[in-house]
């Protein structure tokens, strides 16, 4: 279907002009900052990892607070996602933080479909946002954006290679969410083994085509630090809710008989690198990548399923009006077909019901005739029994009369004999 022709005008070369005085639009950045601060920000983290691998502890350590935490058992029948939303404030900036935990992940004997509930949850958040966008009266200003901005994938510190479950899950998620792989409980592996493990993980991710989040290097302000941090992936982290006294200050650390592992000591683990990259440097980029890349991919696929597209078969631009008319025509045809199917189904159902009623009527009629014949036979039988009984009664009465007559005759004869004897 060809698009309606639209008049186009030649674009003149843009000219640069100098201002003769102050106008005021240099305050736009300040206005934007003020508006953003007043609205607040949202950030949604998905934590994927086995039960007991340290997801909750790391979240507490990252945001320097204690979140609600329910102990999860290892005996769940399947994987279910548990979102928790918190309101945080630092200086005058409000952050609505949502942490989504994958309860029961990796606990089943059959782990083949453990990734499905995670994929379904991410898609459901995209679908909710798309439905809000497509409303006639949208309220995106007040809409709570629950789309996942980052997936922290916790890798067990085996020191050998990635599990097949990890590879399959990350492969299913990499087109839907920004993934940062992290090695949990890194203090259980020696430094040399940890470095070999990092190289092995990255090699397996590349060979299996898993796309993880790369810190952006197109912004000169953060290009250098992001480029250097990309070389440190995956981050080997340690979480702790305990504070240990080192020298004259208290630090977050884990106390062992052989020594102390400091969470924020970069020679001990990559926790500081993760916090800097995730929160201080790239939080905005993670939000933008979620909207511009992952959500747009989901939105495009959904709209194409609904019949919307940018060009037709001849690569001509498609107008929204033409798409609407075409979809409306398809809908009307489909509706008519469904109405005809429903009408035919109704007619067939009526015919079936009529046939069933006629069959029931025939069965009832046959039963009635049978009962009628049975009744007539019983009536004839009773009539015969009545006649036989009446005949027996008549015979009995006749015999009774005869017996009484005979008895009376015998009685009168006896009286005569008695009189004759007396005389």
From Swiss-Prot:
Q: Name one GO cellular component term.
A: septin ring
Region: G1 motif, residue numbers: 49-56
* Any one GO MF annotation of this record: GTPase activity
Q: Per the record, which residues fall in region G4 motif?
A: 184-187
Q: Coiled coil where?
A: 338-404
Please state every residue range assigned to the domain named Septin-type G: 39-305
Q: Which GO terms describe its biological process?
A: cytoskeleton-dependent cytokinesis; protein localization
| Pfam families named among the record's database cross-references | Septin
> What's in the keyword line of the UniProt record?
Coiled coil, GTP-binding, Nucleotide-binding
Instruction: Establish whether keyword Transport is in the entry.
Output: no
Task: Give the matching InterPro entries.
Answer: G_SEPTIN_dom, P-loop_NTPase, Septin
Q: Where is this region: G3 motif?
A: 101-104
Residues engaged in binding GTP: 49-56, 104, 185-193, 239, 254
Family according to the record: Belongs to the TRAFAC class TrmE-Era-EngA-EngB-Septin-like GTPase superfamily. Septin GTPase family.
Official protein name in the record: Septin-8-B
